[in-house]
């Protein structure tokens, strides 16, 4: 029998309420739903809190306001507030694939020595000449295959 692990999703955000809606909506579509979602608002002046609370009927969601600015501090705040056996992190401008959490959980179930997993990133909202466009054209296939040239 497989061990049941709890999964918390940590989301750090700052003044991107509109993008946060898409990220949180993607968590509602997970084939393996999150046990909790911890959203750390890193000092937003927009309607971030309202967006988070609007998902409380679909997700077990916790809003945490963190006035000390900075991604590392905000991530640590999310980790301190998470209760899951596994803590998955997603940025506020990301949309998770429907199987994202299911795929994250599998290695932890198969091997109790696993500590960290990662996955592929698919970019959207990419503008011509952007860093993301360069990465997609030149780097992403190398990372996925381990190719060096």
Name every feature range the model reports, one short phrase each.
Residues 66-82:
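Glycine-rich, basic loop-to-helix element that forms the pyrophosphate-binding segment
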Residues 99-132:
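Conserved donor NDP-sugar-binding/catalytic core segment of glycosyltransferases
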Residues 35-43, 64-67:
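Short beta-strand/loop segment that forms part of the nucleotide-sugar
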Residues 1-28:
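N-proximal low-complexity "stem/linker" segments adjacent to membrane-targeting elements
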Residues 26, 33, 41-50, 94:
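A conserved acidic beta->alpha catalytic loop
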Residues 87:
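Short aromatic/hydrophobic "clamp" motif used to bind/position activated sugar donors
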Residues 21, 46-54, 99:
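Acidic helix N-cap motif at the loop->helix transition within catalytic regions
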Residues 119, 135-149:
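Short, flexible, basic/aromatic active-site loop/helix in glycosyltransferases
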């Amino acid at each position: 029998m497989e061990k049941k692990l709890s999964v918390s999703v940590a989301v750090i955000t700052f003044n991107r309420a509109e993008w946060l809606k898409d990220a949180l909506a993607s968590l509602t579509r997970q084939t393996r739903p999150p046990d909790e979602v911890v959203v750390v608002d890193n000092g937003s002046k927009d309607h971030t809190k309202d967006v988070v609370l609007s998902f409380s009927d679909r997700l077990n969601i916790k809003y945490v306001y963190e006035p000390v600015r900075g991604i590392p501090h905000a991530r640590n705040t999310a980790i301190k507030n998470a209760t899951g056996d596994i803590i998955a992190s997603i940025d506020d401008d990301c949309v998770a694939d429907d199987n994202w959490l299911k795929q994250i959980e599998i290695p932890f179930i198969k091997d109790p020595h696993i500590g960290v997993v990662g996955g592929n990133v698919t970019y959207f909202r990419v503008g011509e000449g952007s860093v993301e466009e360069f990465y997609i054209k030149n780097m992403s296939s190398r990372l996925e295959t381990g190719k060096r040239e």
